């Protein structure tokens, strides 16, 4: 069974392909955000490709071109496409068209269900994968404790949280989102607490990777200031184990790959 995968998002397919390639013949058509790469070069790659099943990540031009020149079998929505872009005057029509025309629509985080099912009641939740054999539990904790927050384009760190962490003897590093993916496991292990996003009611992929690494998290689920008061070394160790168990049971890349392989076979059959 030949599967053509078009585009990637947050290294999701990069994480899944190693667990799928023994069963399927996979052609992975990647692109950059450059104008040429995401338009004419992408179109050429799609036209030249040959697959039994076409799987597209993200509901924009990639999916539209696959629908026009091949067959849009799987559309995997990852976030901003159905959360925000779908409402834009310029690109919303493409997202809606792709959702309606794909044979199967998948969504990566639980909060996307309400957005995807407005256009596809049969949309399926396929969890964001985490390579738990790469993001392994940390063994050493810092004294004083250290927290990390990655800057986001759509929200700011809650006002005063950095000061409150400092007063609680927790050092906070605020990082740009330019850490190479292969460096992320060792980067996360330098910290004890991961500060995630608050405006979106789901864990980011980096947060799940931090949880897999045994970090405690401050997230959308928390009142962030009262949450800080709970963060002593013993609680962090306990939460780290709980978080690791959660990711292993719900987001392990091998489990997600098994789910996706069943979906691919069902579409082909």
Predicted ranges, named:
Residues 198-199:
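Aromatic "clamp/platform" in nucleotide-sugar-dependent glycosyltransferases that forms part
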Residues 100-136:
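Donor nucleotide-sugar binding/catalytic pocket of nucleotide-sugar-dependent glycosyltransferases
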Residues 131-134, 140-181:
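Conserved catalytic-core segment of nucleotide-activated headgroup transferases in glycan assembly
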Residues 43-48, 88-105:
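Membrane-proximal helix-turn-helix segments that form the acceptor-binding/catalytic region
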Residues 11, 230-269:
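A charged, aromatic-enriched C-terminal amphipathic alpha-helix characteristic of glycosyltransferases
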Residues 56-62:
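Short His-centered aromatic/hydrophobic patch
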Residues 216-219:
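Short hydrophobic beta-strand element within catalytic cores of glycosyltransferases
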